[in-house]
């Protein structure tokens, strides 16, 4: 009944050259991230499938999570498949559930870390979809204990840093036992540094809690990182007088320098990674080198 059309009965051999995606640049007004507020991104799927597909999209940025942790987060999202959280913007629910789940394991992200790994969440400026508003809504819907995501407890933020510099032999999900001494040391430095700023009336009280924490953590991280690079270059050691109870584990930092550098470079790419020269100079006074 039907006869093939000669012009369409063709065979073609297509050869693709090597393409480096990292070297491509976006066009003007082109955005590498897209989150639809009013339409379903995966309209042919159920809302549950849509959340899991969205989670896959977001979690690829958290390069330091292993397969067990990623699987655990997928199971957490799957556990709330029958819960209607938002009428619109369903896919944005997935990263919030991931953040709250990771926080329940003792790891939180500063504003700069959120911008680095979840820029869609950080750059949301509407009142309804702002970060703190969404956290409160999802906590209520899922039965989590309500409260602010950002609090003056520095250990969870440095626990995320510890996750990023773990070696490949860590056992258990979100396990940072080998790096726990680093978490304690960085936290102690930050607490004492924060108290110094309080006594000197240098804390900007008009800023949000998240902004103050972000400034403190960023200052400590970049200062320790720069001191570490100098110590590696000169084969020396350094100490911080603010780390009284938990000295900085310099050997651990040197051993994990490549991973630490990768994490710091991710933070440096963000617009919120701004360091006050005054704060940094104040903190530098408490660092000394051992050149012997």
Swiss-Prot record:
Complex formation: Heterodimer of a 45 kDa (A23R) and a 32 kDa (A8R) subunit to form the virus intermediate transcription factor (VITF)-3.
Transmembrane segments: none
Keyword line: Activator, Early protein, Transcription, Transcription regulation
Pfam family for this entry, one: Pox_A8
Name used for this protein in its record: Intermediate transcription factor 3 small subunit
Family: Belongs to the orthopoxvirus OPG134 family.
Its job: Acts with RNA polymerase to initiate transcription from intermediate gene promoters.
Swiss-Prot/TrEMBL induction comment: Expressed in the early phase of the viral replicative cycle.
Gene: OPG134
